[in-house]
Amino acid sequence: MSMKYLMLLFAAMIIRSFADSGNAIETTLPEITNATTDIPAIRLCGPEGDGYCLHGDCIHARDIDGMYCRCSHGYTGIRCQHVVLVDYQRSEKPNTTTSYIPSPGIVLVLVGIIMCCLLSVYRFTRRTKLPIQDMVVP
């Protein structure tokens, strides 16, 4: 991957975060500029990009000739044409029924380990006699 492509992806993520927060207006989006010129490296597409992205915003990069899409939540693809599967979206939020299932299993394993330890201590103390017990005469 070239450095310019990585910069394009990073800038698209920054622009997306501003747009998702509801604070961004097209004229107030941050512009990443090259040190030698004042032409923005990434800008929103003009009228030529209308309808290019099916479910998202069109971005035009100066260094990479072409239009790219910044997809809305729930969509993916080159032109944001694919819907993200429901199972994938569900996996972002923990499901309450599946998050409590491991709890009884963990408790049972811990109880089993404690019982094994107590049983081994009991057997060990039963087999060995302390010297004090030999000295006591009935």
From Swiss-Prot:
Keywords: Disulfide bond, Early protein, EGF-like domain, Glycoprotein, Growth factor, Secreted, Signal. Induction: Expressed in the early phase of the viral replicative cycle. It comes from the Viruses. GO terms for cellular component: extracellular region. InterPro entries: EGF-like_dom (IPR000742), GF_C11R (IPR011170). Residues 1-19 form the signal peptide. Stimulates cellular proliferation (hyperplasia)and mobility around infected cells to promote rapid and efficient spread of infection. Its main location: secreted. Belongs to the orthopoxvirus OPG019 family. Glycans are attached at residues 34, 95. It comes from Rabbitpox virus (strain Utrecht). Disulfide bonds join 45-58, 53-69, 71-80. This is Growth factor. It is found in: Secreted. PROSITE patterns: EGF_1, EGF_2, EGF_3. Residues 41-81 form the EGF-like domain. GO terms for biological process: epidermal growth factor receptor signaling pathway; positive regulation of cell population proliferation; positive regulation of mitotic nuclear division. One of its GO terms (molecular function) is growth factor activity.
